[in-house]
Amino acid sequence: MNKKIIAFIPARGGSKSIKNKNLKKIGTKNLIEITIDQALKSKLFSKTILSSDSNRILKVGKKYKKIERFKRPPSISKDTSKTEPAILNYFKNNLNYSEEYLVILQVTSPLRKIKTLKNFISYCISKKLKNCLTVTYKKD
């Protein structure tokens, strides 16, 4: 793929339903590590950004040389906060980028396959789509 693509990993520190949810382990790795590994192993992204209000989460990203860590303010890191303000806050503070696409990798979707990511991005680019979203159907 010749396109420059950013992987944006939003990961809030506070969770009311499951404490430290994004740091929970599945096997030997936590959800942050799984998502970062998927982004890096896919070799799809020219830049991978971990955005969080939590120093503990950003510290996990520090283990990876190719990860850009971005601390977001508490005002956009609440239980009711959406992902879009975190993305806009990043770009407002980082004006030097040349990427053409942005892919949001939710930490709470650790079962994604790299092949699915590749197929998804390839499809979006080939169809010249401006927006794409993946969903999973619930089987009855």
Regions found by a protein language model. Give the residues of each.
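Glycine-rich phosphate-binding loop signature in dinucleotide/nucleotide-binding domains
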Residues: 2, 93-100, 125-127
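Conserved core of the sugar-phosphate nucleotidyltransferase
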Residues: 80-86, 101, 107-140
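Conserved N-terminal catalytic core of the sugar/cofactor nucleotidyltransferase
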Residues: 34-97
